[in-house]
Amino acid sequence: MYKRQTLRGDIENIHIGEGSNVQDGCVLHTDPGCPLKVGKDVTIGHLVMLHGCTIGDNSLIGIGAVILNKANIGKNCIIGAKALITENKVIPDNSLVVGSPGKVVREVTEEEKKAVWENTKHYQDNWKKYSKSIF
């Protein structure tokens, strides 16, 4: 968790999986019947809005993306910056999604999966390095 996020679990639960990171300016919120679940080793980029959705393991949600109630993002997905994922939308595993509304444009390559993991690992390493001086 970085600075200036808002997590509102006042209506339903919010679960953030081990190794995931939520960057500056994100808002995570729920509605009745719409809990929010973020899987393991997920990167939630700056200024992302997650609302009552599910994000699969090892995914990257790009800067400023919006994902709405009951949307389900599969594992190993990349959601592009500023993408809008509408309510009830199901994104299959290994998908690259861009646009507003978001559309699957192709499968994520092995090289991209590796880059997403390296990005996530970078944030995990930063947490280990700096958390001792922050808290």
Language-model regions, residue ranges each:
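Structural signal for interior beta-strand "rungs" in well-ordered beta-sheet cores
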Residues: K3-V97, G102-V104
